[in-house]
From Swiss-Prot:
Signal peptide: none annotated. It comes from the Bacteria. PANTHER family: RHODANESE-LIKE DOMAIN-CONTAINING PROTEIN 7-RELATED, THIOSULFATE SULFURTRANSFERASE/RHODANESE-LIKE DOMAIN-CONTAINING PROTEIN 2. Coiled coil: none annotated. Its EC number is 1.14.-.-. Belongs to the TrhO family. This is tRNA uridine(34) hydroxylase. Keywords: Oxidoreductase, tRNA processing. SMART domains: RHOD.
Amino acid sequence: MASYRVAALYRFTRFEDPAAIQGPLAALCCSLGVKGTLLLAREGINGTIAGEDAAIEAVLAHIRALPGCADLTPKTAWAERMPFYRMKVRLKKEIVTLGEPDLDPTDAGTYVEPADWNALISDPDVLVIDTRNAYEVAVGRFEGAIDPQTASFADFPAWFRDWRKSVEAQRGPEAPLKVAMYCTGGIRCEKSTAFLKAEGVEQVFHLKGGVLDYLEQIPQPESLWRGECFVFDERVSVGHGLVKGDHVLCRGCRMPVSPQDQASPLYVEGVACPACHDQRNEEQKARAAERHRQVLHCEALGVDHVGATLPTKID
């Protein structure tokens, strides 16, 4: 039976002094054996933590006492083994990097519940934009969604400004944009709606809870999602009902590998995949192969490979 609760959370709110929050939060996590990463910035908090159920509840109670966090609702999963090596509480300029320093992320667009999402994106007047990175989109996407082909979220503002010019050239600048955006768990699409509003787009919507809530709530026969959804944990990808998908993670380049690419002679488990095989030299491949051998050996013994006792990090 799974014994570790994994809680993914974020909240855009105003913290006047994130540094004053950092120390007590890190100390609490350390005292309770909670591990993971939490990012703090003047715009809020973001991260994922894991630990015993009671310990996670205590940390969440502490976070909910912070300004603007009273109704914080994390996404919860369960793991048989501790998925993190240590606790990190970091101060950042942004909790998710967009690179627009004057943006107010609390001035976001309109939430759309998963149950209402299909109707919205089926409207021919609505332009649907995927705010995730290109490698995530390749794993799965909503039918008809626009793929910005970004390498990072920070690329999104420049892409949007260029894309908007091309749209206005076709439709005319007087035609109002009506945009629906989505991401994995909600944080990127929420911040991107604030960005679009700052750019003067009035009708902007985002999927509440992101793709994960949609896949959890919408039955597959009614779904407009195609493929799987990449996730940033050991599952790599999930499908409807949040069932673990068929993608695996390449330990060489950290990119998802499809079932088709897993069948390629260029895929070597723990070493390389078709995307990075020719970019890695023999020395790199040999080191990766040795590390993978050690990982498999430790798994067979039922022990952690490295880092299980790393200290809490505050930076």
